[in-house]
C-alpha cells in the first residue's frame, strides 16, 4: 500500500505552489480554482497544475462562507489531507488526485463526490464514523488515483531531468 507521506517526500510534484485570491466571488474563475478542470480532458500541464496548486485566500483573516447549517470549510483540513482542494466558486472541495486521474463518472452522486461534484457537507468532514475526508482517503478509487499520481510524477521527474 502506498504511503501519502512517502509520496510527498519522494516527489517534487506533490508540493503545493500557493496562489492567492482577493475575493470569494470569482468571475471569471480564479486561476487556482479546481472547478476549471472539472469534467474535461486534461493536458499534462493541467494535470500538474491541479496536483500542485491550492487556492489560498489573500488574507489570514479570511472567513470562509457558512453553509445552510451554519458550518464552514476549515483550511486546517488541508494539513492532514494534502489532496484536498477548496473551490471558492463552488464553496466546496475536490480531491486533486481523483480529479487529475478520473476513471469514469457514475449516476451515484457519492461516487462522484470530491471528483466532479464538490464536497460541501462540512458537518461530516471529520469524525470516526462519518468522516468523509478519511473515508475518501481509503476508497479504492482514491488509492488507484494515488498510485497513478506517483507513477505520473516519477515519469515527469525522469523526463524533465534525463
Regions found by a protein language model. Give the residues of each.
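N-terminal leader/early-domain signal
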Residues: 1-162
Amino acid at each position: 500500500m502506498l504511503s501519502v507521506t512517502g509520496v510527498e517526500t519522494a516527489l517534487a510534484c506533490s508540493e503545493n505552489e500557493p496562489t492567492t485570491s482577493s475575493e470569494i466571488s470569482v468571475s471569471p474563475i480564479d486561476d487556482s480554482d479546481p472547478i476549471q478542470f472539472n469534467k474535461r480532458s486534461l493536458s499534462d500541464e493541467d494535470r500538474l497544475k491541479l496536483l500542485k496548486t491550492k487556492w489560498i485566500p489573500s488574507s489570514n483573516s479570511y472567513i470562509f462562507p457558512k453553509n445552510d447549517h451554519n458550518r464552514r470549510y476549515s483550511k486546517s483540513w488541508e494539513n492532514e489531507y494534502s489532496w484536498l482542494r477548496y473551490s471558492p466558486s463552488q464553496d466546496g472541495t475536490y480531491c486533486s488526485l481523483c480529479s487529475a486521474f478520473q476513471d469514469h463518472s457514475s449516476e451515484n452522486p457519492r461516487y462522484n463526490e470530491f471528483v466532479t461534484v464538490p464536497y460541501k457537507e462540512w458537518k461530516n468532514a471529520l469524525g470516526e464514523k462519518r468522516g468523509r475526508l478519511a473515508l475518501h482517503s481509503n476508497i479504492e478509487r482514491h488509492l488507484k488515483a494515488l498510485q497513478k499520481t506517483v507513477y505520473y510524477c516519477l515519469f515527469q521527474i525522469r523526463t524533465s531531468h534525463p
